[in-house]
Amino acid sequence: MTKTIYKPWGKEVWLELNDKYCYKRIYINAGNKTSYQYHHHKLETNYLIEGTAEVWLENDDGVVDKKMMNPGDFFTIEPPKKHRVIAITDIILQEVSTPEVNDVVRIEDDSNRSDGKIEHEHARPVLCILTAGLGKRMGGLCSHINKGLLPLDNKALISHLIDKTSKDYEIVVALGYKGEMVKEYCEAAHPDRKFIFVNVDNYEGPGSGPAYSISQCKEHLQRPFVWAVADTIITNPLPPLETDWLGLYPTDIPELYSTADVEDDVIVNFKDKSKDGYNYAFIGIAGVYDYSTFWKEINVSSGEIVSAYYNINNYSHIKAKYFDWYDAGTIDNYLKAQKGVGKTKQYSIPKTNGEFLYKIDSTFIKLSSNKSFISGRIARAKQLEGLCPPLSYKGNNVYSYQWIAGKTLYECNDPKIWKDFLSFAQTHMWSKEPHPMQEPCVKFYKDKTHDRLKLFLSRRDSSYQEAHTINGVKTPPIKKLLKVLEKEDLYTGIPTKLFHGDLQFDNIVYGDDKSFYLIDWREDFGGGEIGDVCYDLAKMYGGILMSYSHMREQENFSCICSGQEVFFKYSTEPSLKGFVNFYENWLKSNNFNVSKIKTLTALIFLNMAPLHEKEFGDLLFFQSKLMLSSIE
């Protein structure tokens, strides 16, 4: 089993160590050098695989020769001859030696290391992410979620930090506000990483702050480590952990940031939020090589982790490392980061109800602040086994599954495949169950509609309760239109366990294997596990009338309200327009009540309205009114 040893100048990868020999690969970063050293007993031969190096080696006369070496060159070091390797470029050495690996006497060392084995070099390096805070600067964005979980380029902010470290690093995460969500996300998104989760007992109020949070992690940070706040986003690689360093970015407003004075890439002074500060802002990420000094210097009672750097001269030296940086810690800066860090692909229409989607490599993750929502989804995944992908992670706030290779039915944009799915659904879904439907249908269609309408109107002015002219069509007030809820046939559902609950074309995948898969299924129907086939049919009808894949992007729709005059429009695919008549005829030919399906579709649009951002929510509301007014 290989072992990686991190050095101030790079790293060693030990491929074999036994009682006869040691075999290793040595990686030295350009411009760095090993100790000037000798061995009492160890005999070694080094072969230069890659790069250019200057090798110092004492000869038999006691003179240290200095020689440039290139790939293919090799040298043997006999004890007790002095030697050193200087990397002109990045180099890779292959070393075979006798097994006395701790036999080293350091005459001169840039990091002032002592002789023999350096214990912390043999410990795994670690990244510590501070996520405990409330995220107050993020306003309503953090009402449902920890700020470290806000999505950016389809993954959480903290994933951008985790992905900057090699798999050798352990990840220590300081948990506080919505900490269980953070823990579950990390486990689902990065199952191949070693995490240590630390619950911070005070993350709000007096005494709390980044300094206190990291102090709670101290027992796990008795070795060189990198620490970062959760809302720091960098686009360039992390530097090697070979010295103390601070991450910097140019600034002309030092009163807003801790700032550093830099000479020859070494930090010589440090100030916290002062108009007399310097030209480089500290960005909330740092490498701590001299961890003993860090723990001596930090003033936990101040709450400020930067207090560890107020007495900068107490460190041997701290290097300046410059990053391309986004501060995602305020609403404005988070929105800037969304524009600057890749193009986030919307996998669904944005919601405001605490649901979040992520895609990390081939893993698709659903997170919700509503635990019953997640537990219901997990339970129904078992019922839909064979129709939906198997879950790879099941938590209280998170579940995940492996991404299915294929296209959604919207992406297929092929009426033949859509027709094939209708045949598939009739064969593999909707098997009837003997179950009374009156009560669950009343709860789901009537009671939920009244609750959702109340929620929607609570966020709008009183004009939304009045009559409107919508796209030139006069419609009565919404409460008058909802007399449709008095129709008894609305509550005579077709019971089935094998319902989806959100059966629109974005939630149906046509796999590369020519099979159909259901994703993003509903957790229940009226609080129970038996659903109504008519609801699936109405959901599908709504997604045919309005392409939800288009609705992910705001430029594809508009809704203008001027008093009681309303005009809305949205784009769709010509193929969907042509499919409407086929679908309605298919419903009739299979003895489904088309008028009922249309009524349920109108109610679906109304129920969706309060769950989405304002303009799209308005569009859904007025689309519902328009449909309800046309139903006989």
Label the predicted regions:
Residues 106, 118-127, 279-353, 359:
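Conserved alpha/beta core of the MobA/IspD/sugar-nucleotide pyrophosphorylase nucleotidyltransferase superfamily
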Residues 5-6, 86-123:
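Double-stranded beta-helix
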Residues 382-387, 407-492, 499:
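Conserved kinase catalytic-core helix
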Residues 187-259:
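Conserved beta-loop-beta/alpha segment of the NTase-like Rossmann-fold superfamily
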Residues 120-143:
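N-terminal nucleotide-binding beta1-loop-alpha1 segment
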Residues 349-378, 402-403, 409-412:
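ATP-binding glycine-rich loop module of kinase domains
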Residues 524-585, 602-616:
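Active-site activation/catalytic loop segments of kinase-like enzymes and analogous catalytic loops
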Residues 233-306, 311:
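Conserved core of the sugar-phosphate nucleotidyltransferase
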